[in-house]
Amino acid sequence: MAKVTFVRTKPHMNVGTIGQIDHGKTTLTAAITKYCSFFGWADYTPYEMIDKAPEERARGITINITHVEYQTEKRHYAHIDCPGHADYIKNMITGAAQMDGAILVLAATDGPMPQTREHVLLARQVNVPAMIVFINKVDMVDPELVDLVEMEVRDLLSKYEFPGDEVPVVRGSALKAIEAPNDPNDPAYKPIKELLDAMDTYFPDPVREVDKPFLMPIEDVFSITGRGTVVTGRIERGVIKPGVEAEIIGMSYEIKKTVITSVEMFRKELDEAIAGDNVGCLLRGSSKDEVERGQVLAKPGSITPLKKFKANIYVLKKEEGGRHTPFTKGYKPQFYIRTADVTGEIVDLPAGVEMVMPGDNVEMTIELIYPVAIEKGMRFAVREGGRTVGAGVVSEIIE
């Protein structure tokens, strides 16, 4: 079949396979690319290619991730697959590869397992908007057992606040699709087609960063004689235009109001700047000593300064450059939250957890020495003595 030139005309979406090791995530990923290749929508990426995932670094942590891409009638998908359980945990916590939708792969032979639960919980905490279930290996068990597994997984999803009754559940065998002849009408591909149709219809279109309320972490502050105070940084989300009101948030509970009188990029004045742009904003009525690195410039009322929150933290192993010893309640590292570098204390650990070992992933309560702009699902790094010792994601706001 002739190669089709790739033109990005379809909406783009990031997805990924999650679930217990050996339940068939990588085989399913390969099967999707095989089926899509019949229509010129993908290059077939075999299991072996996906399995030897290249290393990537995110927030000082090394993660193995494979990216494949494919299209359907409706969308262009970038799909991630991680070989090891720890890689999934690290990816979800650092946000190295964001997921707008997740495909939970579950073997009919096992049903939900500990890693299945851990991945679903993390998907909830990092705000993965939607999930679809693929029950794999259905050729190896009785249909009654598959019904039971489906009931179990729907209960599990409901427990973690996903709409368990509405989530599409597709049943099939990824391996059978890999082994089937190259004919898209072969019955072995029916579940793969069903899964892609479910992704197209059930996964909502991602909210683009540009459509969210304006926020820019402040990287640098300087004053220009006769003009006022300029703050620089990369716009994280939203759009900004000159003449608009904004709030300066962080370092104290006081929220300072200001007006952005001009927006510049590469020494040129702009009518508007959007998410991803590196800009300088001239602030009216703010003196240089009122603004500092670590604060954020944001749309009024969109974010509040906080000191106390719960977060899921992955603690690096010694081999990853992390700590050699465990830590307990009362541990005080540095938290790198956007551009802020602030000391905080681990004030609480889950019931029954006395100490946190390198390599653990634990939800803990953190209290910072001063408030910064924080929201659920936000990523940060934990550092001590100039090295990264952990990566975290905010799971709950306390105060």
Swiss-Prot record:
Transmembrane segments: none annotated. Signal peptide: none annotated. It is an enzyme of class 3 (hydrolase). It is found in: Cytoplasm. PANTHER family: ELONGATION FACTOR TU, MITOCHONDRIAL (PTHR43721:SF22), ELONGATION FACTOR TU-RELATED (PTHR43721). It comes from Fervidobacterium islandicum. This is Elongation factor Tu. Residues 136-139 are annotated as: G4. Monomer. Residues 60-64 are annotated as: G2. It holds the Pfam family GTP_EFTU_D3. One of its GO terms (cellular component) is cytosol. Its EC number is 3.6.5.3. The gene is tuf.
